């Protein structure tokens, strides 16, 4: 299975995986509006890979088969202040 991976120009670090290059027919219109004009990053042979950097490859394959697309969003930012407060045991109580 080869899929096309596109990055968003509007949403940093957001990627859209689709079954075929330039085929966005199964991607919902509201998602396409939010994503903006897709920019092709690569064609990716999923059957030759065991893992992906930030996504579960099996989930990607299932969603491509069922929905025709997979949306990869960036992980939420780490709140370093909150992490530090936990580390030192700070509590407002």
Curated annotation (Swiss-Prot):
Q: Which residues cross the membrane?
A: none
Identify the InterPro entries for this entry: YcgL-like_sf (IPR038068), YcgL_dom (IPR027354)
Entry-linked Pfam families: YcgL
* SUPFAM superfamilies, per the entry: YcgL-like
Locate the YcgL domain: which residues? Answer: 1-85
Q: Which HAMAP family match?
A: UPF0745
The molecule here is called YcgL domain-containing protein Shew_2183
**Organism, scientific name:** Shewanella loihica (strain ATCC BAA-1088 / PV-4)
């Amino acid at each position: 299975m080869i899929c096309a991976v596109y990055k968003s120009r509007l949403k940093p670090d957001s990627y859209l995986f689709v079954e075929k290059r330039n085929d966005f027919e199964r991607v919902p219109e509201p998602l396409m509006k939010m994503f903006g004009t897709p920019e092709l990053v690569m064609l990716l042979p999923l059957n030759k890979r065991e893992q992906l950097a930030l996504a579960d490859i099996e989930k990607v394959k299932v969603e491509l088969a069922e929905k025709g697309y997979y949306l990869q969003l960036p992980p939420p930012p780490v709140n370093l202040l909150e992490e530090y407060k936990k580390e030192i045991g700070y509590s407002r109580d």
